[in-house]
Amino acid sequence: MKLSHLAAALSAQLVAPVAAGYLRQDILTAGTLRDTTVPAAPNEDLNQIVSDSQLLSLHRTICEIESVSNHESTVGEALIKYLGEHDFTTEKQIVPVDEDDDSTDERYNVWAYPKGSPKPKIILTSHIDTVPPHINYSLHAPEGDFDRANITIKGRGTVDAKASVAAMIIAALDHMKESPDVPVGLLFVVSEERGGTGMIHFSDSELNTSPPFFHTLIFGEPTELKLVDGHKGNLRFDVEAKGVSAHSGYPWLGHSAISEILPVLARIDGLGDIPVEDGGLPSSEKYGSTTLNIGTVRGGAAGNVVPESASASVAVRLADGTVEDAQDIIRKAVADASGGSKNITLKFPDDKAYPPIDLDTDVDGFELLTVNYGTDIPKLDIHDEDSDVKVKRYLYGPGTILVAHGVDEGLTVGDLEKAVEGYSKLIDAAVKRG
């Protein structure tokens, strides 16, 4: 948002329409599909195809259940039941609802492991919450000749991240059939979409031992079936401006908070394009430029009233450096743009900020990808400083961020089935570590 657009938006006193607590994720390119087309009747029974597949039917079951953040208990119960029926010991890790939500749902993380193996060395983890609104599960046949792999599954959570949840479970079960004592655990957390409350709760619990009993973590998010070598850091902050209200016919009797905040926001908006030596935020060869998004702007009471207050919320995707360094750069930029005005206040309310996250990619057979969106990975503190074996972290999953959170969220049967193969490959590599 450049200054001319920003000024127009502010003068019209508009507020960007965003769901509270959620950040829009960045776009990746779509993946490719294998060619397995065969002629088939146009009235192919899509529901029967799903019912005949353990993977697809599990995916359908959990996607048909609404599980917007802070309302995950029903899908949690479905997973507890399913895993218990398939030789897993399951535990509920109760997680209080987020402070800014009035939900009364008694939701929880799901922790599961093979019977008799409460400390698995390999953990597969993803999240069971979704962004709002819930969109019903639906199946769509491919155009032209029928190809089972190109059946499209749509609905909220079909990609982000219940596709990962279902594929992880089936991959784990496949390994347990071959080797009942395979040391694999499953962790499905709540509120990833609202700041990672579920993963933070697990991280702070007695299950997160020091040193860790696990040596491999496999995280599930939509990555187009590619192995992610890292993602940008995350930082949020708010800017507030104070003014004095007055009749717009006599503006000299007041002081416009919007006029105070405009130059500050203009400066903030360009920090990702300014070299560090000139006061901008850092870039890197791996992650590109640091990006900023002025997500909400609020101010004023009416067009004929000098506004006494204005505010903006900003999300930053860090490409390099530390959170503390970025905060210092932002503080100086705001002070310079405002001339040190006492009417401008800068707040960093998010104690969940983190720098760029580098991940492991030492398993052959995957294309690599770097992403801009955030995950639960930095929310899990790993206490391996004094351990001879360092914990490896992988990020992989079916589907693309291109459609996650949107009205057309969905993926193909082929992508979902390939994800089981991908997770199995990662499990195999982890088993070889011992």
Curated annotation (Swiss-Prot):
It is an enzyme of class 3 (hydrolase). Residues 1-20 form the signal peptide. Binds 2 Zn(2+) ions per subunit. Its main location: secreted. This is Probable carboxypeptidase BDCG_03757. InterPro entries: Bact_exopeptidase_dim_dom (IPR036264), Peptidase_M20 (IPR002933), Peptidase_M20_dimer (IPR011650), Peptidase_M20A (IPR050072). Zn(2+) 2 binds at residue 160. Keywords: Glycoprotein, Hydrolase, Metal-binding, Protease, Secreted, Signal, Zinc. It is found in: Secreted. The active site is at residue 192. Its cofactor is Zn(2+). Zn(2+) 1 binds at residues 160, 193. Glycans are attached at residues 136, 150, 343. It comes from the Eukaryota. Belongs to the peptidase M20A family. Its EC number is 3.4.17.-.
